[in-house]
């Protein structure tokens, strides 16, 4: 997995994973008003509006697959750093600190069109979207669908919740995982 990140950022590209893939059931939350008007609640849109990002960019981000910035790669002289910093200044000016760096990179990719190499989910597996399976023969976590690729990085973004307790904060929280067997 780490090797893929090194390869992905060749020639100034951003190496990163989108939060979309097989088995993901929801792309975005939507609240329906009077049964006909959709109030978009996607992470990108919500953060963009709170940060004062103009409507045209906010709307473009609304249904773009969210890019989680928890794991990424960039060469030190990549142009993407400058674009990201420009966007980060905008998002921090009016928005909250939490989520600003992610919003800035989503704007860089979907609005500024920086060069990007999208990596597979196994490079940044977000458990709150979909739990992995466990391969007890290989003693490793794998994607829950065929061909059950080995997961390289597991990310507890948004936590794992059970009985209103977050596994990141409460080590007594236990979850059940399906196995390959």
Predicted regions and their residues:
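Glycosyltransferase catalytic domains, chiefly GT-A lineage
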Residues: 1-181
